[in-house]
């Protein structure tokens, strides 16, 4: 049976010791979906939001969040990320925005939490910038899409 890596033999939370692990190229992709009204999405896409470019702001927020994941998630290691990418795609037919991230490094631990944090904070930034015009925006389906590198192997999520 697989065990929780962040719990020691006394049942206490602790940071995993990665000092003996080999450095490998590690990559993770994540996504989040933000659902809003047709009018709110149109305002964003047409550049008519009074706060400015919502997607550019969300992209930068997601990148910044990935770089600071270790400050937000208590047992995450500080990582020297070599790449962080955040893409936002308006899905006009469903009044949604698909946010996807890619995080990459050569190191001793994975970058899943950084990828998940990137999409989460990008989604929260969209909500923050749009809450004045719509309060019932929904953030959903925050999930890991893919990870590679390390001894746990390659993971690819099932399509939804």
Curated annotation (Swiss-Prot):
Pathway: Cofactor biosynthesis; molybdopterin biosynthesis. InterPro entries: MoaC, MoaC_bact/euk, MoaC_sf, MoCo_biosynth_MoaA/MoaC, Mopterin_CF_biosynth-C_dom. Belongs to the MoaC family. Transmembrane segments: none annotated. It comes from the Bacteria. The gene is moaC. Its EC number is 4.6.1.17. This is Cyclic pyranopterin monophosphate synthase. Catalyzes the conversion of (8S)-3',8-cyclo-7,8-dihydroguanosine 5'-triphosphate to cyclic pyranopterin monophosphate (cPMP). PANTHER family: MOLYBDOPTERIN COFACTOR SYNTHESIS PROTEIN A. The active site is at 128.
